[in-house]
From Swiss-Prot:
HAMAP family: Ribosomal_bS20
Chain ranges passing through the membrane: none
Protein name, entry field: Small ribosomal subunit protein bS20
Functional description taken from the UniProt entry: Binds directly to 16S ribosomal RNA.
UniProt family annotation: Belongs to the bacterial ribosomal protein bS20 family.
Gene that encodes the chain: rpsT
UniProt GO molecular function: small ribosomal subunit rRNA binding; structural constituent of ribosome
UniProt record, GO biological process: translation
A Pfam family assignment: Ribosomal_S20p
Length: 98
């Protein structure tokens, strides 16, 4: 443990930031998983309510990824890669003819 007051504060700040970053990363992973399950549900039974659920979950995932990038939790390229993979899965499962 640090002895200097400023070093103690930095340790506390680093722990606070670690927990905040962990929460953001966990939320992004959860929303991405929800998107994939919504894609599969729509592919199995395409209907209007399933399509609406897909659009809502995709929008929520994009939003959370963008916020994580904006706050420095994810690197910009990592956020772009996650969004591109979601878009690719969306076009393969939900909208194959487009």
């Amino acid at each position: 443990m640090a002895n200097i007051k400023s070093a103690i504060k930095r340790v506390q700040i680093a722990e606070r930031n670690r927990l905040r970053n962990k929460a953001y990363k966990s939320a992004v992973k959860t929303l991405v998983k929800h998107c994939f399950t919504a894609f599969d549900a729509y592919a199995a039974d395409p209907n209007e309510t399933a399509r609406q659920a897909v659009n809502e979950r995709l929008s929520a995932a994009y939003s959370k990824i963008d916020k994580a990038v904006k706050r420095g939790v994810l690197h910009a390229n990592t956020g772009a890669r996650k969004k591109a993979r979601l878009a690719k899965a969306f076009h393969l499962k939900v909208d194959p003819q487009a």
